A protein has these predicted regions:
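Conserved active-site segments centered on acidic
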Residues: 2-39
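Acidic, metal-coordinating helix/loop segments flanking the phosphotransfer/catalytic sites
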Residues: 41-46
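Short, well-ordered coil/turn elements that cap or connect secondary structure elements
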Residues: 30, 62-64
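Structural signal for conserved beta-strand scaffold positions within catalytic alpha/beta enzyme cores
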Residues: 5, 37, 53, 68-71
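Conserved acidic residues
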Residues: 49
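Short, polar loop motifs at secondary-structure junctions
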Residues: 39-40, 52-59
């Protein structure tokens, strides 16, 4: 499975989000997941299963069903809850 963490520039918040996603996955006992952080402009060419991004970027992803939106990218427990909800809904858990 591949998860990409996306922000406007692909540096600050996406890197923090990547670390939160990795922590959440570890807590969930999910292994063998490739997690990357990228900018919104460079993500289109990347293969991925799930996109994780901040709630602020909701308008950047209209009509997509592969996106998990998170309000606070620093809080691993919030990221974990959002990922669990998404993965259960998609039959990935």
């Amino acid at each position: 499975m591949k998860i990409i963490c996306v922000c406007g520039m692909g540096l600050g918040s996406s890197l923090i989000l990547k670390m939160s996603v990795e922590t959440a996955l570890k807590q969930m006992g999910i292994k063998d997941v490739d997690v990357e952080h990228v900018s919104a402009g460079t993500m289109e060419g990347l293969n991925h299963d799930i996109i994780v991004t901040a709630e602020d970027f909701r308008d950047e992803f209209p009509g997509r069903d592969d996106v998990v939106f998170v309000r606070n990218v620093v809080k691993a427990d919030e990221v974990k809850a959002a990922l669990e909800e998404y993965m259960k809904a998609k039959g990935l858990l």
